[in-house]
Structures are given as C-alpha cells and as structure tokens.
Amino acid sequence: MKKIITLGLLLTAFLGNAQAFTGKGDDKFQVGANFQENATGIMATYDHGIGENMSIGIYTTYLLGVDGDGSDFADEFDLKARFNANIGNVIGLPENIDVYPGLNLGLRNFGAHLGGRYFFTNGFGVFTELAVPIAKYESHVFGYEHLNNQFTFSLGASFNL
C-alpha cells in the first residue's frame, strides 16, 4: 500500500509540472502514425510558439502502406506549413492539456486541422490530430492524387524541445 501511495504522489508531481503549451518560444516535435483512406504512413510536425496562444510550424507525411500498385514518391509524400491557435488555457483546460485548431498550406491543398496534446511529464506526451482539405489545387482528383488530399487522422508522441 505504501508503494502505491508513493507512486501516486510521484505521478501527481509529474502531471502537475507538465505544460502542453507555454507560449512564445515554446517548441514542440511530434511523430506518429497517419491514417487515411487507402493508405497509412508516418508523420512528423514541428511547432514554434510565436505568441501566448499562437504557433507556426511544418508538417510532413510519408505513406508506407498504400493500397494497390503504381504510386510513386510524389504521391506518397506531403509537406505543409501550418498555423495553430493553442487554446487550451483559453478554454480553461489544465496546463498539461492543449487543444489547437489551425490552418495549413501544403503541396496538395489548403486545409484545416484540429488537434490535442496531453503531456505526462514536462518533456513527453501524446497527441491526436484530424485534418481536412478546404480547397484542393486540382478540382478533380482521382486515383493516387487522392492520397494526402483527403480527411486524415494522426496519433503519436509529442515532445517538448
């Protein structure tokens, strides 16, 4: 029983110290899995705080599991610039949780995303993110052009740098 109480107190201390977004100068790196129709892959983001509740960054994806044959590197790779509104503290969430809606501009489209981060410690947490295209550069996409140009779901690990 003594060990359980000690472990609980240690976890509480770590959770109380963790901060999901601290504002200007805050740097986050995320890596995880990306899921979309007919493909799965790996993704990574880097976000840099430019204000109390704003960050800018980059997002990249490479699809590893594409259904069917015939896709090439250009179909499977994507790169985006992104802007986030980090609103966890605005809506009254604990400091180790952040919610961030945002906009992104990529190689295939202009889109929006909604994500959330939960930090267990000051340096490590988990995240999940949904993204949708708002305006596609090609009005009629088909076949492999649909990859990285549709609704996506990502989840993985988040790190404070």
What is each model feature region?
Residues V31-M43, V66-D75, G102-H113, V141-Q150:
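Solvent-exposed loop/turn segments connecting transmembrane beta-strands
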Residues A20-F29, I58-F77, I97, K136-L147:
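Flexible, solvent-exposed loop segments that connect beta-strands
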Residues Q19-D26, E52-N53, G88-V99, N122-G123:
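Short loop/turn motifs that connect adjacent beta-strands in outer-membrane beta-barrel proteins
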Residues L79-A85, N148-L161:
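Outer-membrane beta-barrel "beta-signal"
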Residues F29-A33, I58-T60, A81-F83, P101-L103, ...:
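Membrane-embedded beta-strand positions of outer-membrane beta-barrel proteins
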Residues A33-E37, T60-V66, A85-N89, L105-N109, ...:
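Transmembrane beta-strands of outer-membrane beta-barrel pores
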Residues M1-G25:
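Bacterial Sec-dependent N-terminal signal peptides
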Residues G16-I56, N160:
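Short glycine/proline- and aromatic-enriched beta-strand/turn motifs that initiate or cap beta-hairpins
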